[in-house]
From Swiss-Prot:
InterPro entries: Formate_THF_ligase (IPR000559), Formate_THF_ligase_CS (IPR020628), P-loop_NTPase (IPR027417). Pathway: One-carbon metabolism; tetrahydrofolate interconversion. Signal peptide: none annotated. ATP binds at T74, P75, L76, G77, E78, G79, K80, S81. Pfam families: FTHFS. Belongs to the formate--tetrahydrofolate ligase family. Disulfide bonds: none annotated. Transmembrane segments: none annotated. One of its GO terms (molecular function) is formate-tetrahydrofolate ligase activity. The lineage of its organism: Bacteria, Pseudomonadati, Thermodesulfobacteriota, Desulfovibrionia, Desulfovibrionales. Keywords: ATP-binding, Ligase, Nucleotide-binding, One-carbon metabolism. This is Formate--tetrahydrofolate ligase. PROSITE patterns: FTHFS_1 (PS00721). The gene is fhs. Its EC number is 6.3.4.3.
Amino acid sequence: MSLSPLNYADWEIAQAAEKHMKTVYDLGKDLGLDHKEIFPYGHYMGKVDYKSVLSRLEQSSDGKYIDVTAITPTPLGEGKSTTTIGLVQGLAKRGKRSSAAIRQPSGGPTMGVKGSAAGGGLSQCIPLTQYSLGFTGDINAVMNAHNLSMVALTSRMQHERNYSDEKLYALSNMKRLDIDPTNIPMGWVMDFCCQSLRNIIIGIDGVSGKSDGYMMRSHFDIAVSSEVMAILAIAKDLKDFRQRISKIIVAYDKQGKAITTADLEVDGAMTAWMVEAINPNLIQSIEGQPIFVHAGPFANIAIGQSSVIADRLGLKLSEYHVTESGFGVDIGYEKFWNLKCHYSGLTPDAAVIVTTVRALKSHGGAPIPIPGRPLPKEYTEENVGYVEVGSANLIHHINTVKKSGVPPVVCINAFTTDTPSEIAKIRQLCELVGARVAVSKHWEYGGDGALELADAVIDACNEEKNFLPLYDWSLPLKERIEKIAFEVYGAEGVEFSEEAIYKLNKLQADNNSSDLGVCMVKTHLSLSDDPKQKGVPDHWKLHVRDIMFFGGAGFVVPIAGSITLMPGTGSNPSFRRIDVDTDTGKVKGIF
């Protein structure tokens, strides 16, 4: 690779690398896939027939399983996807057959401030444009499946308003569901960040006209927070997916009984939208390593994991399979540990905690970096004091990973502005708490820059481990929420709103709660529920304002703080810098 990320943008590096891509069939052959197990999407992307592969390799042993997580990030992100790809490249340089699993990027962040989550520099996945803009259509399928349930609901409400019970039955053998228009937890979804759609009124002419819908309050969430996406991430196979889809609660009737997609007779059609999407996607790093891309839930407002199916494939096909959890240990790794591994039955061999000097300085008192603006001078000048104070956040996360019984490996994702003294301080503090540390320069040098990290991960995978969940699922839901708050976030207490307590008690009484997971919704920018609180906040309480219930996924979803399921678009979004070269048809400006 001749282009240096010091001199060229990510999209320029990607376009240069794409001239030498392996075809998806050659990529699959290197991975051990049969020709017929790949469904091509063009020459360089494809889907993998997971059912055929897992059946063929049923008796094969699994490879080593590594999760990549991070400290509490800045709004800029600390390079987890870049590190995931760089680690796979480094492992390949060490002669290990390796693969990665990452999430499909959402159009919201891609067109917003965070970018496409394709990695960066010399550790990114290609083809970049296709990966970043729609890919193989999985998120579109999720949107269609989800929104179809809302079409079924709103049209049913209109017909029940317009017709008597006898007429409903005569027209289509339809029984009245008696839907309560004030108790509809589900909304619509789209794959962009749009604060104007958080609260809307639909069916405005439905009051006076019988054919214009049903007038009521509604809302949009971002598509990756959809329960359909959550089910895609945790389903073992299509049968499991189909069963879960039928249990999604769309609304409640006027007696408070749940109305599901099965009640609306839309669950089969929703599944039909997803029959291709359930097969994981396969692309490559710029050095030719296989990258599975499947599912795309955020970690702050959803489960934050790539799919169980993709990980099962990677473990059967690779000696080392690296998966990624969204945001920090408190958000993404906690859900990997206590939800994804519970559903999959898989246990990790190591956890990589990505940190940067930049993030440690932000936790140590430096001004918070703002996307789209120049970094304050505190981030480009040496300041070991900021690094040392901010390392409390890193150490907190190291100790959390240790509670899971998995050996942590701290990856210092090196920036060109880091100084030897700052790096030495991080290494010293990590070694004092018994964590392996590796400095990695994969962004600048690709796999060659990740050899120290690869060696540390190989070493950690050979260490004895005793993987244990944080809590017993037989505990009451409230106690499990409190345990996450105390043990993972460091809260002194949990305050539940009256509405949250009411919903928790009802869920506890109406369901076998030992079958339900706890999927927290909380800001990713702090250990607390206040994004302004950096480092390791003390003397604080977690504020649970509401509870959602994902009946199909089997999640109780506590919502803490002021976070919303529909992010907004800021004042300097990246779409302002994305364009097309009309002579070549190439997209430029994606990062």
